[in-house]
A protein has these predicted regions:
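Short, well-structured N-terminal submotif of metal-dependent ribonuclease cores
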Residues: 1-28, 41-55, 124
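Structured helix-beta-strand junction loops
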Residues: 22-23, 59-60, 116
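Short secondary-structure boundary segments
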Residues: 30-31, 91, 110-111
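A general alpha-helix detector
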Residues: 34-36
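Short glycine/serine- and small hydrophobic-enriched flexible loop segments
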Residues: 38-41, 99
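Active-site neighborhoods of divalent-metal-dependent phosphate/nucleic-acid chemistry enzymes
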Residues: 62-105
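Acidic, PIN/NYN-like endoribonuclease modules and their adjacent C-terminal/linker elements
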Residues: 95-96, 100-124
Length: 124
């Protein structure tokens, strides 16, 4: 959703609006927030990066899960399980958190989630 030039912008916008309309609870991890901040900072600058953080924090629809030591241990197991696939630690923590919360769908375009056995939610 950061950039209208992103190949998935229109679909991401539609999916987020659909999730909000249906009152589907959304959650993410602080590591995904960190990745979002870094990408926005380097692509759009300080103001845009701060605005992105503010919008996420202000959203009543998004819960931020802060990674724990247990999440870290589970993420390491995910990285080992998915080897040799190049999976980021942030994604592995997401897998661990999704697994511990019995969440099998993700609003993402990242095929690493499919490789880990999760479904990409498409609003249906």
């Amino acid at each position: 959703l950061r950039s209208r030039r992103d190949q998935h912008h229109a679909d991401a916008d539609r999916l987020f609006r659909t999730a909000l309309e249906r009152r589907i609870p959304l959650f993410t991890t602080n590591l995904i927030i960190a990745e979002t901040h870094r990408l926005t900072l380097h692509r759009a600058g300080v103001q845009s990066a701060l605005k992105a953080l503010d919008r996420i924090a202000a959203s009543a629809s998004v819960t931020i899960h802060f990674a724990t030591a247990d999440d870290h241990s589970a993420a390491l197991r995910w990285l080992e399980r998915l080897r040799p696939r190049p999976t980021t630690y942030a994604d592995a923590v997401s897998f661990a958190v999704m697994e511990s919360n019995s969440c099998n769908q993700v609003l993402s375009f990242d095929e690493d989630f499919v490789a880990a056995g999760f479904s990409l939610w498409r609003g249906r």
